[in-house]
């Protein structure tokens, strides 16, 4: 007989005490930006299926059920509770949240004491270990079926809560575990169906989002007893069979057997004192066994609860699984623009399939758990990676589910669906290309088919045009939305039509940016080269856009010297930082992009596409002509770059500003050249000198290396201008990219020191599971839930090279 044991929590998991309070958490830099405070835990849910977050305090407080939109608010009635009574002893009972509701509701409940146990997280698994209160040893492991290479289960809107209970005493203990849930069907859709876009105080565009929070009219709860499964299903009266956004179901369930007693109450008032379920549960761990499917009246709230009671003998261990699932199959963008979610490819699209997902979860959760372990253990057990990096590698993947993530149902054009992660909640547009230059390394290595799908969407967007005029937030100028041939900054926003209407951001005129076209070419070649070098059709899909956008970018080479010039207004990823003339950053990316285009073209000449529709008549002649032209541009640019910008210690910011700032990411193009096995942009001796200068000036000289690498400071670590914004920020994802570059150039020890500093900034200061773009030297942050921080997987790649 298989012996049941308590789970072994990996030592690498991030941990804090249950109910941790933060004395001085970092706070947001701009008041208009999002700052939900530090009480964030690991999300649960599938990629693109919506997710929920359960904090280290034990409450469910993050709700990303409506694709692309963010709600942070605790629902106290969504909660576990535990009753324990040793034989001949006193009973004790607690709701497993350390924070009582602020509105005074559920006043009959007893709330778990702060500090009695620990919370651990190693995405996609997390654990609550309860200590010092109960006589039994009690651990709840939480996870969703997300693991590398899973293009099916990783999309499931399912959360598993596996309870492990061990009796270390010499007497039997009666235990009861209760799960309560509030019916929120219908809440998660925007009540404001408007395309109005406003400009915030930081110049970035924002649209209004107001969920139908608390609108439970017509909601009803049902007890489901299905063979050995028992649970509560949360539904809503709706008109017609076709679900709209926000329509669907929630459910939770557990398994039962003769050793377990099941109790239920399917309709209680979560805004009252909670006595309907608490009094019985606190008395003996039971519930009144009350069923009521009456739909909720206007202003009424309803919740349901199930309790499982059992006796555990001395020295024995028991496991009790609870499965929570939701089925909201439709994501609506602009009014009438609807997409089905990826999981509907496996469970249907009518919004009535939540119980099928519950059954799947109860049947397969052990297998899912093992799949996650098999994926994680080679990294956790390897001596190649420091322990703090193992923790951060997995926990930064929280954004795969919590990044406002979209993953649509498959189509003939997109056989694994379309995919997108927001730049962040404050900058609410998808897959910003400059950001994903580093931020896409996780998707590349873990879900390469999705990474290619994103780049194919950019390829389709490049030849499009949108002449709609807009006001630019940075300077008030007017500009068109999207120029034909320009690589778009992003793939659009949740309030319009992602993938179809690109270039949502209007803080700068991104048609003028000098890095985006190069970024596109580099990522196309990278995605081919680092995923097996056998998907020539992917290159064929993107080739025409490679050619078109390089021609577009060359149009900014006003003196025809071989390198496009920056125009003075911020026109690259550091979009509050003026570059003028030839710049080290954009010039290096341009040279490496041309090298990549030459490689792509030669691959296509040698490899006709599998899909004949991808190759036009005369394609070979057109490719050959493009290669001749690109080679000419490349040779002229190469001759110029080093001699124009090198100052003996590092590459100058640009040729037009006269600045002596050391730009930390100045050799991003050289990093990509080394990554892709391309000819160097600059010789290795200059690379090493530059990296040593960056390490000294931007890290050690910037507040003694306390925060990480600053984007741009003078050689002594001081500011060029005291009121600079981007230059004086430490960007998490940029730091991770630079560290990967350092590792490739023999500075592993220094690089890992930098990365550990940044990781500690995140996880020691209340920024866990909301990693920001930027940290400042005055303990503030900007742009939480940021995509670029997934660039920590570039460090993983560099350590494996």
Question: For each predicted feature, which ranges?
Answer:
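Beta-strand-rich N-terminal accessory domains
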Residues: 1-88, 93-96
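Acidic/polar, glycine-enriched structural segments that form the non-catalytic walls/loops
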Residues: 2-25, 31, 127, 132-135, ...
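Short, solvent-exposed loop/edge-beta patches enriched in aromatic
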Residues: 43-58, 70-91, 121-122, 131-136, ...
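A generic secondary-structure signal for well-formed alpha-helical elements
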Residues: 51, 55-56, 167-173, 181-189, ...
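An extended acidic
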Residues: 57-61, 67-133, 235-284
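Aromatic-rich carbohydrate-recognition surfaces in CAZymes
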Residues: 81-86, 91-104, 167, 215-219, ...
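Acidic/His metal-coordination segments adjacent to aromatic residues that form catalytic metal sites
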Residues: 415-420, 491-512, 565-583, 648-655, ...
